[in-house]
């Protein structure tokens, strides 16, 4: 089963190996626009700085949809730009395969802290269903040390009786210089390590192993990602959403 827990050391070795192989066969930069501004300075962690995101594209379910999802104990999604693209397709799969309601709060470019803010606001206004998908973390590569505290915050809001499904991170922006790509990869693994450590302390945190799925076949870094971060459609979108559905169904 793709979503089974990997050991931290094995997962990091596989991801690093796959990334280095892919870097040797790097394709031309993607024609798609990036969700964040070009890297001007490497910043403290080599990936640059997170650009302004508040005016970026977003997909946010209306109040009736959220209330219906909470009432039916359906599935809610908090995500970033990948979810802006893929969230509606995930919602259709949730309806078709799990036969339940779906609502989302997805905003391109938002870091985990902003997604957890939205989660807290929904918890106050609507409550939360028992299944929560967190598809954020990609925009935390610019400041990885802050991520763990936001995971803990999300889990406190969710409480022990809800399950949080967190999609791990694979970022290595192909339209940045090689040194930045390496920093992106290193910071992605740092974020994923923090997720693994949190899961050891919280049995209701389930990791969706997207990074390990990509690393298991290095070709997927090109067939399932269009720019080193965002999924291709339909291949990458279908693969990632299927992993999320598998995690929910097997919990």
What is each residue range found by the language model?
Residues 77, 89, 93, 131, ...:
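Extracytoplasmic/secreted proteins, especially bacterial periplasmic and envelope-associated proteins
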Residues 101-103, 163, 204-206:
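Conserved beta-strand segments of alpha/beta enzyme cores
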Residues 48-55, 63-150, 173-175:
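Conserved SGNH/GDSL esterase-like catalytic core that processes O-acyl groups on lipids
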Residues 97, 161, 202:
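Acidic-histidine catalytic/liganding microenvironments
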Residues 127, 159, 200:
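Short conserved AdoMet
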